[in-house]
């Protein structure tokens, strides 16, 4: 009986200690996750062309749920006939053309873009992008989060 009582007492003390440490408000914060990996298949969204551009696009907002991320990193696939509508830019924004062809309007200029082109739009500029040809226009978009 003494052994059973000793075992029960030890178990009870251990359980109380475990519970008190588990629910202690003064626990150290967990370190921030060191990396995040996302696959485009998991985040793809069918969307109309942004900024009233029209047509069908697929948007990929990578790391949109990452806490305190200061950058926006997106991929957009513009299907034939679709566009990103002409709009005012409030922060630096980079478009990088992965594949396909398009026509970009930037302020008073209009010019062709293709795979390998990178376009930096500065604050206060306006721009839009129209897909051309039969192939999808695939771009990466990067800017500072608001």
Where are each of the predicted segments found?
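Conserved short histidine dyad/triad with adjacent acidic residue
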Residues: 72-89, 123
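Histidine-centered metal-chelating micro-motifs
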Residues: 83-84, 103, 119, 123-129
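A short, N-terminal "cap"/entry segment at the start of jelly-roll beta-barrel domains
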Residues: 19-70
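Ligand-binding loop in jelly-roll beta-barrel domains
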Residues: 67, 123-146
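Glycine- and acidic-residue-biased ligand/ion/polar-headgroup-sensing regions
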Residues: 90-93, 97-102
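Bacterial Sec-dependent N-terminal signal peptides
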Residues: 1-29
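Short acidic-glycine-tyrosine-enriched beta hairpin
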Residues: 109-123
